[in-house]
Amino acid sequence: MKEATAARPKHGVLYRALSEFRHFGTYPFNMRILLLTNMLYAFVLPVVELFVGTYIMRNSSELAYVVGYQLAVYTGIPITFLVNGFLMRRIRIAHLYSFGMLLSGVSMAVMMSLETLELGGIILAGLIMGLSYGFFWANRDFLALASTDDGNRNYYYGLESFFNTVASVVVPGMIGAFLGATADHGWFAGNINFAYKLVTLFVFVLTIVASTVVMRGRFAEPKHDRFLFRRFDTLWWRMMRLAVLKGIAQGYIVTAPSMLVMTLAGNETTLGTLQSIGAIVSAVLLYLLGRFTTSHHRVAIFSAGLLLFALGGAFNAALYSAAGVIVFMLCLVLGRPLMDLGYFPLQLRVIDCVSRREHRNSYAYIFIHEFALYLGRFFGCGLFIVLTLAVSDTFAIRYALLIIGVIQLISIPIARGITHTLDQSER
């Protein structure tokens, strides 16, 4: 008689983690490669988005320089989308994607090499970073569209948001502590700018590893079709309005945390600590949303992100203190990925629909979508500059987020209408 064997517990943390890993393995190979690449690059983005802004603030104390840098970045992105559309006909898409990741390290190196921070040098570094983002996002969007379908895009963007949120905990906390300790303990003879250069080296190493991973993908190359058009389906123009509204928040959302924390809350250590608070819970929630929700839940998820952003802006305007910054950062840590989780799958679903209707290269929609985002970003940055010049820096930092958050709420009925039209067309 065989001895009875104890049944393995099927509710432990390790078992559940292995189960989720096996579930990940059921998805298409190219989708998994793309997610692994994005996971690695997720640890670069917080460095670029957060600490470049604080580096400019520390070495110039000019809020306008931070916004000028961001405008240069946003100007470089759509130009690169245009160039990328032509290069895709001659160069492998994985190579262009890798080039974009590597350029982010080059931009930071240019910034750190400047002996004195002047507007011209800052704009040059911003344009290079714009090239980096352009090659990265243009090819990433195309690969995401080609490697996923509407049935698995919630999972794709949920897992991607999980990576991004975990990185927003680990990277700001570690690098913020490193930069703070450099200043407090006199490491490198107290030269904090040398510490920033070591952070730039860290970025280079990660981008090289991420580039190696994406080269393993077996991605189909795009068709050499025309991608420049002026007329589009009415459904796409509605999507473009949504893109402009999304861009308005992007125009200020990247630099806002750096300016708020350096102005009201402290230094880089504080910046890293604030980003870490509550982000672990956010990461788990985002993964679960991506794992178990469907396309029918996207508008609700998107709306929740928009409401959180507006709520954070309201608290910042009302309190305008370190406490207000903490509340805003907590709202941002959860609200921003919720907006992305609801927005990007909807965008790709619309592209699938209108590209079939109009028999066009899907990159045509990815390209023009970026220009809609640029219009919004320009408005967002421009609003801050106008408020700064017309009133004061304090007024701009205090109220711009609230104004943008309220404007963003217009996106909710637009997204609901787009989803309704898509559902009707697919019946």
How would you label these PLM feature ranges?
Residues G12-P78, L235-S276:
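Helix-loop boundary and gating motifs at the non-cytosolic
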Residues L102-L117, L307-I326:
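C-terminal ends and interior cores of transmembrane alpha-helices
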Residues G121-M129, Y196-T207, A322-L338:
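Alpha-helical transmembrane segments
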Residues T54, F86, V169-N193, T263, ...:
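Transmembrane alpha-helix termini and helix-breaking/packing motifs in multi-pass membrane transporters
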Residues I33-E49, Q70-G76, T80-N84, A125-L179, ...:
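Substrate-agnostic recognition of the 12-TM MFS/MFS-like secondary transporter fold
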Residues M1-M31, S147-I253, V406-R427:
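Intracellular loop-helix junctions on the cytosolic face of multi-pass helical membrane proteins
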Residues R58-N59, R89-R90, E115, A146-D149, ...:
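Membrane-helix boundary and inter-helical linker elements of multi-pass secondary transporters
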